[in-house]
């Protein structure tokens, strides 16, 4: 693993009996015991000891029993989104502006291209109001997930991340197994996980319903 703070933490619960998938975000700036009674921002646990340390932190502080993990970088998310044909997402003027800014760095980090979205004119009085639905490619949708400077701050940021993951699950449900297998082949090398490919294959019926 890379000795850097984690950007995002999402706890995912998969119920194989009810076919239900639930997601809960942990704010990365939450003050938690990250180990040895050291209290600091939760995202530091990953830098201190990788995914295992992050899991220990969550289990210790939140009384959970997490045993498995998957970590991925921006490149993996971009790849999945592009493999599924992009996402149609309603955006506000503020989100378009911030997303375009993040796209510059996301494109450099992943080596993938994008086209900046044109901001509507004139600038609306309420910049947080939805101005339209836009088709986003991997770089754009990943940059959308990174936005944290709108009025909703980190709460809005984590909500966007869960929204994108939910939309990806929905698209995967209608993509077909051949597309899902292609995504696995493309993305698995970019992911560090405690799960084997066989484990993930066993989750597919639940994840795609």
Which residues make up each language-model segment?
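Second-shell loop/turn segments in exported
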Residues: 1, 40-48, 63-68, 131, ...
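Solvent-exposed coil/turn segments that connect beta secondary-structure elements
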Residues: 14-17, 26-31, 47, 74-77, ...
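Flexible, polar/acidic helix-loop-strand segments at domain edges
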Residues: 2, 82-179
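Secretory-pathway/luminal and periplasmic proteins that interact with or process carbohydrate-rich
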Residues: 79, 89-90, 192-197
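C-terminal solvent-exposed extensions
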Residues: 34, 38, 136, 174, ...
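Solvent-exposed, polar/charged alpha-helical surfaces in well-ordered, non-transmembrane soluble domains
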Residues: 40, 44, 52, 56-60, ...
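Extracytoplasmic
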Residues: 4-9, 18-26, 37-39, 53, ...
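Entry/capping segment at the start of metal-dependent catalytic domains
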Residues: 1-19, 202-207
């Amino acid at each position: 693993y890379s000795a850097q703070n984690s950007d995002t933490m999402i706890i995912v619960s998969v119920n194989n009996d009810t076919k239900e998938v639930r997601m809960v975000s942990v704010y990365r700036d939450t003050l938690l015991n990250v180990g040895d009674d050291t209290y600091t921002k939760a995202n530091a646990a990953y830098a201190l000891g990788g995914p295992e340390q992050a899991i220990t932190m969550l289990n210790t502080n939140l009384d959970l029993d997490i045993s498995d993990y998957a970590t991925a970088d921006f490149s993996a998310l971009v790849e999945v989104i592009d493999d599924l044909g992009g996402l149609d997402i309603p955006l506000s003027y503020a989100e378009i502006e911030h997303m375009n800014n993040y796209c510059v760095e996301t494109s450099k980090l992943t080596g993938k291209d994008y086209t900046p979205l044109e901001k509507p004119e004139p600038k609306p009085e309420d910049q947080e109001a939805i101005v339209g639905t836009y088709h986003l490619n991997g770089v754009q949708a990943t940059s959308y997930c990174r936005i944290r400077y709108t009025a909703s701050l980190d709460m809005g940021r984590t909500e966007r991340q869960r929204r994108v993951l939910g939309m990806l699950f929905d698209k995967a449900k209608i993509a077909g197994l051949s597309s899902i297998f292609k995504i696995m082949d493309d993305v698995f090398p970019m992911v560090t996980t405690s799960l084997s490919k066989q484990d993930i294959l066993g989750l597919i019926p639940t994840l795609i319903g």
